[in-house]
């Protein structure tokens, strides 16, 4: 019984090793009372309190005394004590009377004194290592009445099944058993024979072991999602090759056959090999060196990829990336980061379902630019529940990109090429059709006062300016067809009051042309044409008979600019051209400006009112392509134009002599304001 008598008449003292004392201290740390532990191991409670005070010293002694011989000898002593009883009815020791047996099992000389080292647990410190497992003789003789049936299996395959905390119980939750140090204390549950799991150590040490295991075996890193697997996921396990663990005869009940019907547990998850597994839930890229072909998942497994986590077999080396992707996958957020667009698109994607995305949906699976991660969906399509959020992000990005003229040009080019079969008036907008014209117009825009007509547009697009109607078509339609707003074209658009209507039809974001063909937008476009017609008529001083040709439409101010004595033919230096006009004592410009300011006040107000009406209609509109960002931008734009339009009127009434120059300056500042708002 391993109990020696001291002097006659004193209580029997147990010769406990430091390992036994540390085990008792650990039971106290795990929540048992000192009294119950002292009663179990047969020492006074005061002695146990003294052990707790000297815990560090005992741990050091336990580390020093942990040798193979000690383990085998201590086990032999315990076995010899009950050997005469044979099979479980014998005297003391491990196979003592049934009512005492459970208490003595807790004193097995397993070492729990320090952090678990896998090699030591497998080979040195296991109490059953001294037995011969080559035959079943010892198993039959010992009977294992007090031990769970697969204790020997746990001892043999300990590297693959380190989480031994009663995880083979059918009703046990595997993830709870894996992390709870109290999950298998049978003085709380009384369900199994062993009084305490060999791994029921403190929570901090068990967490350390979990982290260490996750580093050693990356297949365990996805353990957090064990419960989301279906109960029949046991077929995901693949048996570990027999050469990798110490070859020992398993316990009488076969390890794999007994638990094949149970759910995926931490033990068999650890056994799963990345390369094997017919139905493992991953998009593995096989034969990378040979063919590099992508193995797309089978259709039966594809639906579960939205909710369940993936294995690590195909991941890139970055663990942080894997963690992010697995969190997204478990939360069902995978469509927030769609696969890259395979067409080589350099501009922000056009919102909603444009031909870009339609061509993307046609390819299954999509052409990836990187190895597929768990968050990429098999078909490249967007999940419906997140499509609105994704569209909002795209719209916001596109509206921000319109501030960059290069990105805007690319977006306009791309939208035009994608929709040439739909667009009927694309040929009229010369600045849309020809890339060289777009570049030229971007480089040669002028920022003249509103009375000056754009020379560059007249000179390079003579065929588009045959009549005022077609000229205005060319101005308004590209805006409606998805061309981002021309931020510096002051001469092309006659007055800032027209821009709300142009924007309300185009909404400052690359859009398909089909969207703009609603009755409201066509009405506002025709009204805009009429207003511009009236302005051109009054500026040129022509009669209203017949359409205005470009030669007649170019006003006398343009004639003064085309004069050979005028050195500023590039139309880019505003102050120089104004000074040149004044030096030549050409009074027609100032008179026309005064006329223009008088006659357009009512038309500006009317146009702004139309813009506000259209804004109200847009707010009540249920078209999903109209985003809140666009409405906010349009609201700010109209407000900026209103403020920039009222200040010239006030200054004009206050200073009638200098009305022309002040009005020009104020309108320029108003335009700068709206440009800043955008």
Swiss-Prot record:
GO process annotations (BP): antennal development; central nervous system formation; compound eye development; regulation of DNA-templated transcription; segment specification
The UniProt record lists the keyword Mitochondrion: no
Stretches with biased composition (Acidic residues): 462-478, 657-667
Compositional bias (Polar residues): 241-254, 349-363, 449-461, 495-508
SUPFAM superfamilies per UniProt: Homeodomain-like
Keywords of this entry: Developmental protein, DNA-binding, Nucleus, Phosphoprotein, Transcription, Transcription regulation
Tissue expression: Coexpressed with danr in the presumptive distal antenna, but not in the leg imaginal disk. Both proteins are also expressed in the brain and the eye region of the eye-antenna disk. First detected in early L3 eye disks in cells surrounding the newly initiated MF. Levels are uniform and high anterior to the furrow, lower levels within and posterior to the furrow. Limited expression is seen in small groups of cells in leg and wing. These appear in the location of prominent sense organ progenitors at relatively late stages of disk development.
HTH psq-type domain: residues covered: 7-58
Low complexity composition bias: residue spans: 372-381, 570-586
DNA-binding residues (ranges): 34-54
InterPro entries xref list: Homeodomain-like_sf, HTH_Psq, RD_transcriptional_regulator, WH-like_DNA-bd_sf
One GO CC term, this protein: nucleus
Annotated localization: Nucleus
PTM sites of type Phosphoserine: 251, 254
Result of knocking out the encoding gene: Flies exhibit partial transformation of antenna toward leg identity and small rough eyes. Ectopic expression causes partial transformation of distal leg structures toward antennal identity and antennal precursors into eye tissue.
Chief subcellular location: nucleus
GO MF entries: DNA binding; DNA-binding transcription factor activity
Subunit structure: Homomers. Interacts with itself, danr, ey and dac to form a complex (or complexes) containing the RD factors.
Function: Probable transcription factor with a role in the retinal determination (RD) network. Regulates ato expression and is required for normal R8 induction and differentiation. Danr appears to repress Dan expression, but Dan is required for Danr expression anterior to the morphogenetic furrow (MF). Dan and Danr lie downstream of so and require dac function for highest levels of expression.
Protein name, UniProt field: Protein distal antenna
Gene: dan
């Amino acid at each position: 019984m391993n109990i020696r008598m001291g002097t006659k008449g004193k209580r029997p003292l147990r010769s406990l090793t430091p390992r036994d004392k540390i085990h008792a201290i650990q039971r106290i740390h795990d929540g048992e009372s000192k009294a119950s532990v002292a009663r179990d191991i047969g020492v006074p409670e005061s002695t146990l309190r003294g052990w707790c005070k000297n815990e560090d010293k005992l741990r050091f002694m336990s580390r020093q005394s942990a040798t193979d011989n000690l383990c085998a000898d201590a086990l032999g002593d315990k076995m010899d004590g009950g050997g005469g009883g044979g099979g479980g009815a014998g005297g003391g020791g491990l196979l003592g009377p049934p009512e005492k047996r459970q208490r003595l099992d807790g004193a097995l000389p397993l070492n729990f004194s320090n952090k678990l080292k896998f090699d030591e647990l497998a080979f040195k410190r296991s109490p059953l290592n001294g037995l011969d497992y080559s035959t079943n003789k010892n198993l039959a003789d010992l009977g294992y009445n007090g031990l769970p049936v697969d204790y020997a299996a746990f001892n043999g395959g300990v590297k693959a099944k380190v989480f031994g905390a009663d995880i083979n119980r059918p009703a046990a939750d595997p993830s709870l058993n894996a992390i709870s140090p109290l999950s298998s204390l049978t003085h709380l549950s009384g369900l199994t024979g062993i009084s305490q799991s060999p791994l029921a150590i403190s929570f901090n040490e068990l967490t350390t072991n979990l982290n260490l295991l996750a580093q050693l075996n990356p297949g365990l890193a996805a353990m957090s999602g064990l419960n989301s697997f279906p109960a029949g996921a046991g077929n995901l396990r693949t048996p570990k090759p027999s050469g990798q663990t110490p070859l020992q005869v398993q316990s009488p009940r076969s390890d794999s056959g007994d638990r094949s019907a149970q759910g995926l547990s931490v033990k068999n998850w650890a056994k799963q090999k990345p390369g094997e597994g017919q139905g493992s839930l991953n998009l593995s890229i096989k034969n990378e060196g040979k063919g590099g072909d992508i193995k797309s998942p089978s259709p039966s497994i594809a639906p579960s990829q939205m909710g369940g986590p993936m294995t690590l077999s195909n991941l890139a080396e970055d663990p942080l990336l894997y963690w992010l992707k697995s969190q997204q996958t478990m939360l069902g957020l995978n469509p927030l980061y769609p696969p890259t667009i395979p067409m080589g698109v350099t501009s922000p994607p056009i919102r909603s379902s444009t031909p870009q995305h339609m061509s993307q949906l046609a390819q299954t699976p999509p052409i990836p630019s990187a190895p597929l991660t768990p968050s990429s969906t098999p078909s490249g399509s967007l999940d419906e529940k997140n499509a609105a959020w994704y569209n909002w992000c795209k719209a916001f990005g596109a509206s921000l990109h319109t501030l960059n003229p290069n990105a805007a040009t690319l977006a306009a080019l791309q939208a035009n090429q994608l929709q040439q079969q739909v667009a009927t008036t694309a040929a009229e907008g010369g600045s849309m059709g020809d890339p060289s014209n777009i570049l030229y117009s971007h480089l040669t825009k002028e920022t003249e006062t509103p009375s000056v007509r754009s020379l560059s547009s007249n000179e390079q697009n003579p065929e588009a300016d045959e009549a005022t109607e077609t000229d205005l078509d060319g101005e308004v339609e590209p805006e409606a067809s998805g061309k981002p707003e021309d931020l510096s074209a002051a001469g092309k658009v006659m007055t800032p009051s027209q821009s709300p209507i142009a924007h309300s039809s185009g909404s400052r974001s690359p859009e398909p042309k089909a969207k703009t063909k609603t009755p409201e937008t066509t009405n506002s476009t025709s009204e805009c044409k009429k207003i511009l017609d009236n302005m051109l008529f009054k500026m040129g001083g022509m009669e209203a008979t017949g359409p205005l040709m470009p030669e007649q439409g170019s006003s006398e101010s343009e004639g003064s600019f085309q004069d050979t004595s005028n050195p500023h033919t590039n139309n880019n230096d505003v102050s120089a051209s104004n000074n040149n006009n004044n030096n030549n004592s050409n009074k027609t410009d100032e008179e026309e400006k005064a006329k223009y300011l008088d006659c357009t006040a009512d038309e500006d107000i009317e146009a702004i009112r139309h813009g506000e009406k259209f804004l109200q209609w847009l707010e009540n509109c249920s078209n999903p392509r109209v985003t809140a960002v666009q409405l906010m931008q349009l609201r700010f734009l109209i407000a900026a134009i209103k403020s920039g339009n009222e200040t010239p009127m006030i200054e004009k009434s206050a200073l009638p002599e200098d009305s022309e120059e002040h009005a020009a300056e104020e309108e320029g500042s108003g335009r700068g304001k709206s440009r800043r708002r955008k």
